[in-house]
């Protein structure tokens, strides 16, 4: 059977799979997928024909990986850990770090099966299994990149940002942050929301599938997707009865790539009333 066929068949009987009962073919298939996700050869989601496509069988392999290993001691410099998933950098040498070309600041944690591209900087942060972090991206202090999340090139995830995963609670599709996006401090993007290329999300903005994303120029309301080039802040919209307001994210303006390249992030956010 093909790698995908083995994974699909195993997922159908996942409740029966334990570290003691898993057969060799299934274990090898799962571990092969994790290795290919780790190297960036496979991605849980990718853009095909201009649209994001989720490879569900790869996500299933990530889920299955939790079924085939017992918890074990993991050495972590000043302490120890006890988990089923190995750490990505456990066997890295100085030459391998140099070859792969990214920086990892002490206390940053990346699980095996996550891909980190060249010129990335990982401050003390957390990147979960199956995630993809594109070239030139900064994952700032206390930011978290959830399981299978897809982060584009030249993205800045500011301090304390949370990008949701697919494992807990179980989600159909990963959260996606497009190329050249800025996600402000303490913001959360979860539940498979897609933030398209070149967006600027202000600090403290929370976006899930049920969050109304209101475009103040057009009056249009989006769900689950922030259009390319949007500058977004937190806000509220009045209820139908007019007695209260409910949270929303507000698109205050649109910028193209040229403007984004010339104008600082702070300037874009300071001029939202124009």
Curated annotation (Swiss-Prot):
GO terms for molecular function: 2,3,4,5-tetrahydropyridine-2,6-dicarboxylate N-succinyltransferase activity; nucleotidyltransferase activity. Transmembrane segments: none annotated. It comes from the Bacteria. GO terms for biological process: diaminopimelate biosynthetic process; lysine biosynthetic process via diaminopimelate. InterPro entries: DapD_Trfase_Hexpep_rpt_fam, Hexapep, Hexapep_transf_CS, THP_succinylTrfase_dom1, THP_succinylTrfase_N_sf, Trimer_LpxA-like_sf. Signal peptide: none annotated. Homotrimer. This is 2,3,4,5-tetrahydropyridine-2,6-dicarboxylate N-succinyltransferase. It comes from Haemophilus ducreyi (strain 35000HP / ATCC 700724). The lineage of its organism: Bacteria, Pseudomonadati, Pseudomonadota, Gammaproteobacteria, Pasteurellales. The gene is dapD.
């Amino acid at each position: 059977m093909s790698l995908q066929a083995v994974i699909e068949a195993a997922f159908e009987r996942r409740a029966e799979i334990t570290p003691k009962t898993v057969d060799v073919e299934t274990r090898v298939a799962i571990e092969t997928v994790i290795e290919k996700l780790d190297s960036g050869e496979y991605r849980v989601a990718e853009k095909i024909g201009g649209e994001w496509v989720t490879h569900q069988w790869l996500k299933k392999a990530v889920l299955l990986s939790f079924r085939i290993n017992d918890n074990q001691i993991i050495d972590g410099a000043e302490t120890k850990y006890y988990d089923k998933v190995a750490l990505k950098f456990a066997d890295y040498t100085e030459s391998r770090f140099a070859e792969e070309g990214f920086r990892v600041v002490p206390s940053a944690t990346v699980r095996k099966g996550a891909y980190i591209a060249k010129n990335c900087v990982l401050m003390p942060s957390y990147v979960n299994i199956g995630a993809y972090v594109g070239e030139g991206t900064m994952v700032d202090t206390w930011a978290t990149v959830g399981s299978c999340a897809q982060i584009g090139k030249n993205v800045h995830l500011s301090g304390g940002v949370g990008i949701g995963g697919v494992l807990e609670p179980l989600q159909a599709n990963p959260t996606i942050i497009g190329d050249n996006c800025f996600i402000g401090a303490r913001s959360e993007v979860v539940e498979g929301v897609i933030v398209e290329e070149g967006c600027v999300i202000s600090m403290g903005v929370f976006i899930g599938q049920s969050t109304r994303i209101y475009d103040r120029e057009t009056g249009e309301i989006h769900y689950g997707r922030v259009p390319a080039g949007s500058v977004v802040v937190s806000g509220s919209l009045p209820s139908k009865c007019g007695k209260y307001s409910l949270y929303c994210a507000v698109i205050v303006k649109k910028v193209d790539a040229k403007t984004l390249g010339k104008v600082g992030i702070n300037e874009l956010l300071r001029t939202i009333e124009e």
